[in-house]
UniProtKB/Swiss-Prot annotation:
This is Large ribosomal subunit protein uL16. The keyword Transit peptide does not apply. The lineage of its organism: Bacteria, Pseudomonadati, Pseudomonadota, Alphaproteobacteria, Rickettsiales. CDD domains: Ribosomal_L16_L10e (cd01433). Part of the 50S ribosomal subunit. The gene is rplP. Keywords: Ribonucleoprotein, Ribosomal protein, RNA-binding, rRNA-binding, tRNA-binding.
Length: 136
């Protein structure tokens, strides 16, 4: 799973998702991409599940790019613990995905295979998405 090698701080504020994405809104590598419609927090496990689903559908042909990286530590308190006594330890990493952000890109497979792979990947993600394509 994706996680940062080093962090400046162990715990992060909860934060909010930005209104619309300022960068990463256009296709940079592939011919087909998965673009978010909602803003939400996507975990490293969800990204990995989407990657596995897409590569399995592509039968390991072509190329898949992951354009988001989980860099925000999310902390959680254990089950059945009373309120207070600190924030809790970091459990997993997530990324705040803004509306309009490209999350996955695909190149090197037929159109119907790419569309099916991105549909399968989008089913694993908590955000609503749409598939975009490059017009040349």
């Amino acid at each position: 799973m994706l996680a940062p090698k080093k962090q400046k701080f162990r715990k992060a504020h909860k934060g909010r998702v930005a209104s619309t994405a300022k960068a990463g809104t256009t296709l940079a590598f592939g011919s087909f991409g998965l673009k978010s419609i909602d803003g939400w927090r996507v975990t490293a496990r969800q990204i990995e599940a989407g990657r596995k689903a897409a590569t399995r559908c592509m039968k390991r042909q072509g190329r898949l790019w992951i354009r988001i990286f989980p860099d925000v530590p999310v902390s959680k308190k254990p089950a059945e613990v009373r309120m207070g006594k600190g924030k809790g330890s970091p459990e997993f990493f997530a990324v705040r995905v803004s509306p309009g952000r490209i999350m996955f890109e695909i190149e090197g497979v037929e159109e119907n295979v790419a569309l099916r792979a991105l549909e399968l990947a989008s089913a694993k993600l908590p955000v609503r998405t749409r598939i975009v394509r490059r017009y040349e």
